[in-house]
A protein has these predicted regions:
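PRPP-associated nucleotide enzymes
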Residues: 1-377
C-alpha cells in the first residue's frame, strides 16, 4: 500500500502551549483520530522495513516514545527481523521500577522516563538502540535520552538510530546527528517553515467536560493476566507471544454478532499496540465489519468546527490510571460496539465513568472493557 504525505499530515493547535503551539496530527496513526488499524499497521510496517534494511546484520533494541509513538515502536519491533528487544518510555509510576529521567521540554507533560531494570543485560547483547517516533522536530528529547543512557551505562558504547514517520528537522540538525553517528530514517521529510495551517482560527469550540456518576452504559468486563509490561525491556519473542496469547483468548470471548458491523477499539494513553492489533485481527476474522482504533490521550488539543481541521470534538476525562489526572478523547462517534482495552491494573472507577459518559453521549449503547493486567500471570 502506498501512502502520500497528505495521508499522514494534518496540523492542529495545542491548547495553552506557547513553546510549540502547533503539532502534526497523523490521521493514520490511530492516536487522536479514529483510524483503520489494518492501514495503521501497514504504515508502521513501512518504517520497520527501513529499520531492517538500514541495520542489516545488527541486533536492535526498539524504543517507542510515550505517549503517541508506543504503537509505532511496537510495530517496528514486531515487523523488523533484526529487532531483538522492545520497550517504551513512560510517564507512569511503575511498582519496582528504576528510572532514567529526561525531559520533553515542549510537551504538555515534560517528564519522560526509561525503566532501567534489565536494561544493562540487554545492552550487552545488542548493537544499537533505535528510537521510534511519529514525528521528530529537533531530536532534542531523543538526544537527552541518549545522553542519560550514556551517563548511566558508560561501559556500553552502543550506537543509536532514529526512525520516524515524519521528520521535520532542519538541515543543520540532521547534519549534527549524522556527525554523532546517529542515523535518521523516516518516511517523509517536511519543512516546518513552509507549512501553512489551512484552517480558520475563529471556529474553535470548547471541549466537553465528561461528568462522573451513574452511567447508562454498563460495560461487559473481561480481565486477562499477562505478567508483562511493555515499559520494561522485553525480548521480542516474549513480546510477540504475549500479544498472540491475548488474541487467542480475547477474540472468542468477544462473541461478536452479525449486527455489530461498526466497531471501535479504544486504547488508553500509553497502551496502544495490543488494542490496535486486536482491532486488526477482528477485521481479518470479520471482513464485513468496519473497525476503527484510536486512544485516549493526555495531550490537550484545540477542537474546531472548521471542516479542514482534523479534530472536531474533545471530551475531557479523568484517567483510568490515576485520580485527578486529566485526559482527553477526540472525534468520538456512534458505533455498534465500543471495546475499551487497557492495561490499568487498578482502574480508577471515577475515570472510567467519565469515559463511559463520553461514549454514551455520542450515541453508543454497547461496550466491552478488556483489562490486560500486567501484574498477574
Amino acid at each position: 500500500m502506498k501512502f502520500e504525505l497528505t495521508d499522514l499530515l494534518t496540523i492542529a493547535k495545542r491548547d495553552n502551549n506557547t513553546l510549540r503551539p502547533y503539532l502534526f496530527v497523523n490521521p493514520l496513526q490511530g492516536k487522536h483520530i479514529p483510524a483503520d488499524p489494518k492501514v495503521s499497521l501497514q504504515l508502521f510496517r513501512l518504517l520497520a522495513q527501513k529499520v531492517e534494511q538500514r541495520y542489516q546484520g545488527e541486533r536492535l533494541l526498539a524504543i517507542g516514545f510515550a505517549e503517541t509513538a508506543t504503537a509505532i515502536g511496537a510495530a517496528v519491533a514486531w515487523y523488523a527481523e533484526n529487532v531483538a528487544y522492545y520497550m517504551t518510555t513512560t510517564r507512569e509510576d511503575i511498582a519496582g521500577a528504576e528510572y532514567l529521567h529526561f525531559t520533553e521540554s515542549h510537551s504538555h507533560a515534560t517528564d519522560q522516563r526509561l525503566i532501567a531494570n534489565g536494561l544493562e543485560d540487554c545492552l550487552e547483547t545488542i548493537d544499537r538502540i533505535v528510537f521510534a517516533e511519529d514525528e521528530v522536530t529537533t531530536g532534542s528529547t531523543i538526544e537527552k535520552c541518549i545522553n542519560e543512557l550514556r551517563r548511566r551505562f558508560p561501559a556500553s558504547a552502543k550506537r543509536f538510530g532514529i526512525a520516524s514517520l515524519v521528520n521535520s528537522m532542519s538541515d543543520q540538525r540532521l547534519s549534527y546527528f549524522s556527525e554523532q553517528d546517529i542515523s535518521c530514517d523516516y518516511l517523509y521529510h517536511i519543512d516546518r517553515e513552509t507549512m501553512s495551517w489551512g484552517f480558520d482560527e475563529n471556529q474553535w469550540v470548547e471541549p466537553h467536560k465528561s461528568v462522573k456518576g451513574a452511567v447508562e452504559i454498563v460495560p461487559t468486563r473481561m480481565t486477562y493476566g499477562n505478567g508483562w509490561d511493555e515499559r520494561f525491556v522485553t525480548p521480542k519473542a516474549q513480546f510477540k507471544d504475549k500479544i498472540d496469547t491475548l488474541m487467542k483468548v480475547a477474540i472468542p470471548d468477544l462473541a461478536l454478532t452479525a449486527a455489530q458491523r461498526k466497531i471501535l477499539v479504544l486504547g488508553t494513553e500509553e497502551f496502544m499496540f495490543p488494542a490496535m492489533f486486536l482491532g486488526m485481527r477482528i477485521e481479518e476474522l470479520h471482513p464485513d465489519t468496519t473497525v476503527r482504533f484510536h486512544a485516549t490521550s493526555r495531550s490537550p488539543i484545540m477542537v474546531s468546527e472548521d471542516v479542514n481541521y482534523p479534530l472536531h470534538t474533545r471530551s475531557e476525562l479523568e484517567s483510568l490510571y490515576e485520580k485527578g489526572r486529566k485526559t482527553n478523547v477526540y472525534n468520538l462517534c456512534k458505533y455498534d460496539l465500543v471495546i475499551i482495552v487497557t492495561d490499568a491494573c487498578e482502574i480508577n472507577e471515577e475515570g472510567l465513568q467519565t469515559l463511559l459518559h463520553a461514549i454514551c453521549e455520542h450515541g453508543n449503547k454497547n461496550c466491552i472493557l478488556i483489562r490486560w493486567r500486567n501484574d498477574v500471570p
